[in-house]
Amino acid sequence: MKKLTILILLAMAVVCRASAQNRVVTGTVSEEDGTPLTGAVVQVVGTNNAATAAIDGLYTLKNVPSGAVLRVSFLGYDPVEKKVDADRMDFILKASAQEIASVVVTGMQKMDKRIFTGATDQLLASDVKLDGISEISRGLEGRSAGVSVQNVSGTFGAAPKIRIRGATSIFGDSKPLWVVDGVIMEDVINVDANSLSSGDATTLISSAIAGLNADDIESFQILKDGSATSIYGARAMAGVIVITTKKGTPGITKVSYTGEFTMRMVPSYSNFNIMNSQEQMAVYQEMYDKGWLNYANTVYRSESGVYGKLSQLINTYDPATGQFAVLNTPEGRNAYLRQAEFRNTDWFKELFRNSIQHSHSASISSGSEKGSYYASVGAMVDPGWSIQSKVNRYTLLVNTTQHILKDKLTLNLIGNASYREQRAPGSLSSEVDPVFGTVKRDFDINPYSYALRSSRTLDPDEFYTRNYTPFNIKDELSKNYMDLNVSDVKFQAELKWKITPKVEVSALGAIKYQASSTEHHIEDSSNQAQAYRSMATSIIQSNNPYLYDNPDEPNRDKYSILPQGGIYKRSDFRAKSRDFRASISYNDTFNDKHILNLFGIVEVNAIDRRATSFQGWGLQYDMGETP
């Protein structure tokens, strides 16, 4: 019994001693005028034990040892440290000389906005991001004065036309320079601003930041005027957009997941002023009555629809029935045309589908006095709005900061990578007519353009005529398509040494590798492949522009350069860039009024771009793409 009593008393003594050593500290964090500082971090110095001030500035910190030191910090305010001497401790923070709203991030340094002589805007990523838009650069439209954003294509990977200072050059580029975490983002292929609206295949890899996850971006800094050229040289004559990615917060461990699901509905003709099939047939009938349409001429045209098909069927004999496909009588012709009149094909429903694009992002961040880290992975899956189109993108970002000698020596390591696989309808480069100034594209099968421009009298399952050969848009999309693969990896390290409170030197090194490949498959029975060998009659043979007319043999008829098989085109682009920068800065304030800022820098950049291409004509797709 005595032994049990001694054990109980000993246990009570241990509990009392533990209670005396650890306590719960509560209090408030506010400004000098009493305004609560929501989000201020209260941390036990030397540990990961921390709490965040609530909306009223109140905080509660548990397991605080007696005699410990609390450190309170908040962006834009000078940190405060106090020794724990009571269960309630209130903190009042003073605004620092450089508040966050007054700091300009140029990509090379952070400086007081009061001494920055250029025109600039700072935007938070949360204000720019648009739901359902995977590429965050499109959200800059209307967010900053003088910044014009023109979304020339809805296809993922195609960069929008961005103008910060208007048209800065007649023949040169007018697109801004992108800088991410102090490193210039080089394009894997240089596409000028005018070519962005061309619809060429290269525009799908024209965006410098398509590999960035929008959830990993903290803020944008837009440098608008000529001061940007003093920092980045002539390449910045069209402005600079500086992106800062997220970092870990000391004292707070945060795990987050973001899922976004976007449903895109099939477009509707009700949004466009387009005639229905009955109205179109009325126009065709008027053209026929006035002699603009006749059956004989439509048979040999390079492109024809209902009337061309009617001419073919009138001359198509079916031995099984002993009759022609369409009787060449007023009744027979009118019966066929009446079907087209009331067909009213909805090309949007034929070529588009209701789809759900979903993106997922998971991140973890934490930190202490010794350092912080932020890591995230992301995936975007787009099954495609139109047939024969889809995109999958995967991203990775790791951002760590280590304080080697407290606040004197800091090492920042950033690594990010992305991979994208994409399928899109086949497309050729556009051509400009130098005489008339018109732009044309051969074998254009863009689903959206086709739905807007094609007659609604056409049967979606029938083959009509284009390029002197049978054509059906759904069949062509399945046999004429492009596969793209884009990947990029970047690693950078920055070392900052604060020699004195006023003098700081830094060195940054970065290496980035980008690779993209585009494979254009044009199968044997596609309209494009057959156009190069269409010469059913002498009239078609003499008029088909895709047949070869040998200038050395003027008396010879045109002939095919693709008598059989299909076409395979592949383009590979590689870009390897290296950056090194060393700088020294001096900042001082005299009498709380005068600010002196000196900054010196030396920078070396190098980029190696390589492009290879291959074209294979006559490949047998049904035999494993063999010649």
Task: Report each predicted region and the residues it spans.
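Short, small/polar-rich motifs associated with maturation and membrane association
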Residues: 1-7, 12-398, 403-404, 409-416, ...
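Surface-exposed loop/interface segments of Gram-negative outer-membrane beta-barrel transport/assembly proteins
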Residues: 174-175, 191, 250-341, 384-389, ...
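Outer-membrane beta-barrel strand-turn architecture
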Residues: 367-370, 404-406, 497-503, 588-592
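Beta-sheet entry/capping signal
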Residues: 161, 177, 372, 502-509, ...
